[in-house]
Each structure stands twice: as structure tokens, then as C-alpha cells.
Amino acid sequence: MCGIVGYVGFRNATDVLLDGLRRLEYRGYDSAGIAVRTPEGLKVVKRSGKLSALAQAVGKTPLQGALGIGHTRWATHGAPTDPNAHPHTTEDGRIALIHNGIFENYLELKEALEARGHRFRSETDTEVLAHLLEETYRGDLLEALREALKAVRGAYAVVVAHEDHEEIVAARTVSPLVVGLGEGENFLASDVPALLPYTRRVIFLHDGDVVRLTREGVEITDLEGRPVQREAVEVDWTLEAAEKGGFPHYMLKEIYEQPWVLENTLGGRLREEEGTVELGLALDPREVDRVHVIACGTASYAGLYGKYLLETLARLPTEWDVASEYRYRDPVVDSRTLALAISQSGETIDTLEGLREAKRKGARSLGVINAKGSTLTREVEDVLYIHAGPEIGVASTKAYTAMLVAMALLAVWFGRARGALALEEAQSLLREMRRLPRLVEEVLEKRPLVAHVAEKYHQARDFLFLGRHVQAPTAYEGALKLKEISYIHAEAYPAGEMKHGPIALIDEHLPVVVLATKGPLYEKTLSNIQEVRARGGKVIAIATEGDEEIPRLAQDVIYVPEVHPLLAPIVSVVPLQLLAYEIAVLLGRDVDQPRNLAKSVTVE
């Protein structure tokens, strides 16, 4: 990932590409590049760093041509270097391509290609497709792309150019791709803002679409070559609205980005046959005897989920701390303690200070981080990036679910290395993890039901959230989301704690959100729901599809797909995000910039 632009027409392609990439800068990136079809063939210029470095390089060697592709990259496979930047080319330089997403099976493909004599020049998964195209190309670029894509597995938006063809071909699955329609010219982009100076007629490609762009027109087929019809729409957006992808708020856009974000977090990391994961960490898991989780707010709830998984799957003793308290309690730390610091921004001062305290006492350190180049990335020994992309809404959504997935990956990694997690159980978990992006898509389809529930309860003065075991952090996060953006008072407790105090609050005016998905503690959760009902409370249950018992007990039920109980929080939190959002909108709140809050808290 991150930004894609393609152009074929009559203008100077370099100008269109650089302008489009600038309009996608808000997505974040660490390198950039373009390829232009010139009279001398395809010419590629790419640089790590900011677009200004690329523009400066292009200025020294102007590229003249009316067809080209451009990309801004946020590194997932390989460091942010010039060779790893896109576009990538075939070995003869006649084909260039750019790619958002992850090819999950790139390592096995790379090994097979190297065995057939191909030489790689980068560390990226994307270059694998360039070599596959070199093998499949027989004169028809679109057919070559279709055939090459049959070999890859994962999420992608791919755009390809060839020096002998006045056309661009592209395909998408999960990662977004938009066609812009002009007169005597046509465009491609990963997001609408790149297209707005040139056209407002666009086609949003669907999963499995393959497209050929020429100056004269656009041809769309599926992966088998069958023609498909896609409706062209007129976008009437301001630039700000375009950056929101047509959504009214960044928060809602980011909620809907979660399927492909989870693809990115998982991408290339699952090794199902071996029952393990590839995290690229230098840390030796056998040298860790205990973990101290250090985080704030939403990230701390991801860390609490991580504690449950590390202890369950890896039998690794794990302490969970609010970062602002950690260094003041004089924690017991030694050289076999791992300080696990979790932060979206990598700049949260309380987390940084907690980490520094642990390091002063001799702890090893690992960061689970979204923002590359942040302070936290420089202060930890190792980093597990979550690859969620820029998150602009102050209330975290996609970064949270990506952190949960990162915690699950880390727990499997430790569990297998420590001999605590059996092969069959690990394989089962990894298979379930691969399903998560699709399952989250299914949950997003429940938005109309969630909106109906929000309409019923948006005037409530208080909410109570309850969950057990791994769903306790989900309850905490659901309450936090509601507080952050609706300004409604909300509390969360492990469901078993309700009778130790909070039960005194329950009456006919209190909505109680209960995480009641299937799992080992399901029957105990049902008992908690009955306790709430007996005192007049209104129960909103998050339940597993097919559950016939819950509707007899709860006033409102939002179903989520069945998944391994340890992974249920990743799908269960999505309706809570939507519920908070819908209530805040009904109350007229500033969803993206709620009062008194900042995206990154850099003061103690």
C-alpha cells in the first residue's frame, strides 16, 4: 500500500501522476515512484522519502509521454528504500507494475521463480508478480495479467504498463481501485481525490474485476475473461469529502476499511502448514519468561486481549498495565522480561515513559505500532507493524482491530516457539484468522440493524457494557468508543463483576450491552443477562449467528459470524464501533474531532 495513479491520454503523464500522488499524500507513505511510456521505452524513477525527492529526481531527467503509472508506498515487505519502491519491472524492463495489498504466498512463488532462473532486485512481494508477468506475457497484456494472478493469493490492487502497448491493465481484490472516465483520456486511482482535477465520472471496481484502459475507452472483465458491466457514477465531492471516500466522516470510512486493513496485518505472515507465523522479529521467544504490556486507552485494551492470548496459547505470564501508572509502581523487571509497548501513533508519551522505565530496569522491548518512523519505533529493539494505514478519526477503529490481530499473531508465535501450542490447534487458529477480513465484511452489512438499535437508545444517559474473558476488553473498548464520540456516560466490567457493585445501577432506564458470543463461558454470560432482565435493564446482545437462546432474553440482538472463541473480539467490536458512531451522529456530535481529545497524546 498506499497510493495508486494511472493515466493514458494526451496530457504529460508525469504531471498527472505527480499531481495525483500529491492528492493521496494524506494516506501516508515512505517512498514513491512513477513509470512513463516514452519514445525510448518505459522509464522508471523512484525514490524513498517524500514526493519532493521524487519530483526533484524527475526534474533532472524529464519523462515525456502520455501514458504512465505512479505509486506511493508504505512499506510492508522490505524497508523503505529506492529498490523496494514501486514501480517494479520485469528483468528486461519492458513491463512495469504497481501494487497495493499483500501477496500472501510470495515466498513460495519467489523460491520457484528463482529456481527457474529469475533474479530479484528487491525485497518486496510485488516483484514476484513482475516475474510472473514476464512468463505469462505472449502479446496480450490483459491476458498475461489474468494468468499471472491465478498464481497469487491475497489482497491486491495491481496496475500494469508495457512499453509496446498504448494501454494500462489493472485488477483488484479487497484493495480499492477507481477508474476515472475522460474525453480522449482515462485514469486509475486507489482513491477519488487523485481524479478530481480531471473528471468526476468514475467507476468503482469490484472484487475480481480486471480492466483495460486506453485513450478511447474502458473494458472490464472478471478473472476468467467474461465481460462485466459496472455503472459509471458522477461524484459531487469536495476534496475533503473525496478523501473520506464519500463517507460523511473519517471514522465511518475507517470502520469500513477494516477488512482490507486486516488483510494487510495478516499479509504474508501466516504459515498454516507449519502452524506458525512469520513476524520478522530478531527477538528469541525462548529468552522471554514474562511480558509486561504497556499501553494507553484503546491500545491498552488491545494489550489486555493480548494478555489473555499470551497466557492461554503460550503459557507466558503477562502483566497488563495502564502506561501512565506503570513506571510509578516500581515494577519487578529483569533481562528475561519483555516490555510490550502498543501504540497507534508511536508518540504516546505515557507509553514511551513506561517503556523507558522498563528498559532502565533491563527489560527487552518490542513495539506493536502503526506509524513508521515514530519515536517508539526508534526506542524499541523490535517492531511488529500493524499496517493499518493512516487513521485520521480521533477515535481509533481500524488500528484497534489490527492490534488485536497482531496480538493473536504474537501469541501463536510465542506459543509454537515455547512448545505450548500444539500443531493442530495452531493450524486451526491460523485458518480462522485468514477468514477474519471476510467475516468483518459480513458484520459491516449489519449497519442498518445497528442504526435501528441506536435510534432506540440514543437518548439514554448511561450505558453498561459487559463481557467475559477475551470479551472483557471488547466491553471496555465499546464503552470507551461511546464515551469518546457521543459524550454519553458508559461503564464496562467483566460480566462476573456486575453483582459486586454495578448491579445497583440497573433499572428500566439503563441499556446494557452484553458480549454473548459462543465460547466456554457462554452459559455464565446467559446467567448475567437474566440478572439484568430481572432488574428491568434493557439488554443489547452481541451474539453468534444461529443462537436461538439469546432472542428469548435480550430486547435487541446483533448477530456476528461464528469464529474461534479466542478471535471473537475481532468481529464483535465492529458493531460496537458502529453503535457508538450512529448514536453520536444522532446526537449531532463532531465524530472525527470529539471535544477535549487528541489523536496522539504527547503530554503526561
UniProtKB/Swiss-Prot annotation:
UniProt-listed SUPFAM superfamilies: N-terminal nucleophile aminohydrolases (Ntn hydrolases) (SSF56235), SIS domain (SSF53697)
Keyword Lipid biosynthesis among record annotations: no
Limits of the Glutamine amidotransferase type-2 domain: 2-216
SIS domain sequence ranges: 281-420, 453-594
GO function terms (MF aspect): carbohydrate derivative binding; glutamine-fructose-6-phosphate transaminase (isomerizing) activity
Enzyme class label: transferase
Record EC number: 2.6.1.16
Family annotation (InterPro entries): GATase_2_dom (IPR017932), GFAT (IPR005855), GFAT_N (IPR047084), GlmS/AgaS_SIS (IPR035466), GlmS/FrlB_SIS (IPR035490), Ntn_hydrolases_N (IPR029055), SIS_dom (IPR001347), SIS_dom_sf (IPR046348)
CDD domains the record matches: GFAT (cd00714), SIS_GlmS_GlmD_1 (cd05008), SIS_GlmS_GlmD_2 (cd05009)
GO biological process: carbohydrate metabolic process; fructose 6-phosphate metabolic process; protein N-linked glycosylation; UDP-N-acetylglucosamine metabolic process
Gene Ontology CC annotations of this record: cytosol
Reactions catalysed, as given in the entry: D-fructose 6-phosphate + L-glutamine = D-glucosamine 6-phosphate + L-glutamate
Active site: 2 (nucleophile), 599 (for fru-6p isomerization activity)
UniProt keyword terms in alphabetical order: Aminotransferase, Cytoplasm, Glutamine amidotransferase, Repeat, Transferase
Role according to the record: Catalyzes the first step in hexosamine metabolism, converting fructose-6P into glucosamine-6P using glutamine as a nitrogen source.
Assembly, per entry: Homodimer.
Name by which UniProt lists this protein: Glutamine--fructose-6-phosphate aminotransferase [isomerizing]
Provenance organism: Thermus thermophilus (strain ATCC BAA-163 / DSM 7039 / HB27)
Lineage: Bacteria, Thermotogati, Deinococcota, Deinococci, Thermales
Gene responsible for this protein: glmS
